């Protein structure tokens, strides 16, 4: 892996399952089995990312467990508990033009239709009805805001997203 590529974190390894090195998997993907659509995985062990292959996986009650290449004992599996699971950015599926990965929206500057810089997207929250951008306001915000919450509703509040330019144009009152 080249040093300038930051892996996309998709989950983490949980506790051991059994004596043969299987591990529980916590997936951050939409569906828990979605994490297995990607191969190979990168595992962050002792601060270093390394490639690992999933040999097999299965449901175990309400959990999902996996057997990883080179992990054949409970002791070795215990060493991997809580390690992050990632993939290279180019392994991500291409999206239609009007869809975006959250990771690409975080760090974007948010500008309203009057040209007011509302701040930078710090987080995104899934609410059920629509995603919400948590925008960290600039230090000298004219409206005294520290953070703004903007619904991510394209065509209504979100007018344009420029991932390359790291900018989002919104129809939103900065006083909200």
UniProtKB/Swiss-Prot annotation:
Biological process according to GO: ribosomal small subunit biogenesis; rRNA processing
Disulfide-bonded cysteines: none
Alphabetized UniProt keyword annotations: Chaperone, Cytoplasm, Ribosome biogenesis, rRNA processing
Molecular-function GO term, any one: ribosome binding
The keyword rRNA processing is assigned to this record: yes
The keyword rRNA processing is assigned to this record: yes
InterPro entries per the UniProt record, alphabetical: PRC-brl_dom, PRC_barrel-like_sf, RimM, RimM_N, RimM_N_sf, Transl_B-barrel_sf
Entry text on domains: The PRC barrel domain binds ribosomal protein uS19.
The protein, known as: Ribosome maturation factor RimM
Native organism: Shewanella sp. (strain MR-4)
């Amino acid at each position: 892996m080249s040093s300038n590529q930051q892996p996309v974190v998709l989950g983490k390894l949980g506790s051991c399952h059994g004596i043969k090195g299987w591990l529980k998997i916590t997936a951050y993907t939409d569906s828990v089995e979605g994490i297995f659509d990607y191969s190979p995985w990168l595992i962050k062990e002792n601060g270093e990312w390394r490639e690992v292959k999933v040999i097999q996986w299965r449901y175990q009650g309400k959990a999902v467990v996996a057997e990883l290449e080179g992990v054949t004992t409970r002791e070795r599996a215990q060493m991997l508990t809580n390690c992050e699971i990632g993939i290279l950015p180019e392994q991500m599926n291409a999206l239609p033009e009007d869809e975006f990965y959250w990771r690409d929206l975080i760090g974007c500057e948010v500008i309203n239709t009057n040209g007011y810089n509302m701040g930078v997207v710090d987080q995104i929250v899934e609410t059920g009805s629509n995603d919400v951008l948590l925008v960290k306001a600039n230090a000298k915000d004219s409206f005294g805001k520290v953070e703004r919450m903007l619904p991510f509703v394209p065509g209504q509040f979100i007018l344009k997203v420029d991932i390359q330019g790291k900018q989002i144009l919104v129809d939103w009152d900065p006083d909200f």
